[in-house]
């Protein structure tokens, strides 16, 4: 005869790994060409001047410079630019 009750089972105990999304370089900070500025799902932030967009909507710098965030355009969308280093 068992001395302990059966442990039973659970349907919990799983979770997906975090994707580490978000802003990686903030406004006013220096960045090198190719550096990631924002990792995102969809275009929450749009690519502005001297900024490229990867196939997963990651925004990255095309030139060395400083990051600048701005709201502009229809509905005041958020854009990110890289101002080239002088």
From Swiss-Prot:
InterPro entries: Ribosomal_bL27 (IPR001684), Ribosomal_bL27_CS (IPR018261). Pfam families: Ribosomal_L27 (PF01016). It comes from the Bacteria. Coiled coil: none annotated. Residues 1-21 are annotated as: Disordered. Belongs to the bacterial ribosomal protein bL27 family. Residues 1-10 have a biased composition (Gly residues). It comes from Ralstonia pickettii (strain 12J). GO terms for molecular function: structural constituent of ribosome. Keywords: Ribonucleoprotein, Ribosomal protein. One of its GO terms (biological process) is translation. GO terms for cellular component: cytosolic large ribosomal subunit. This is Large ribosomal subunit protein bL27. NCBIfam families: L27. The keyword Cell membrane does not apply. PROSITE patterns: RIBOSOMAL_L27. PANTHER family: LARGE RIBOSOMAL SUBUNIT PROTEIN BL27M, RIBOSOMAL PROTEIN L27. SUPFAM superfamilies: Ribosomal L27 protein-like. Gene3D superfamilies: 2.40.50.100.
């Amino acid at each position: 005869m068992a001395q302990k009750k059966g442990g039973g089972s659970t349907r919990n105990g799983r979770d997906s790994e975090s994707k580490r999304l978000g802003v990686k370089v903030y406004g006013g900070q220096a960045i090198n060409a190719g550096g990631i500025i924002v990792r995102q799902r969809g275009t929450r932030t749009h690519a502005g001047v001297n900024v490229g967009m990867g196939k997963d909507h990651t925004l990255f710098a095309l030139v060395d410079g400083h990051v600048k965030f701005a709201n502009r355009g229809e509905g005041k969308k958020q854009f990110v630019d890289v101002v080239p280093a002088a």
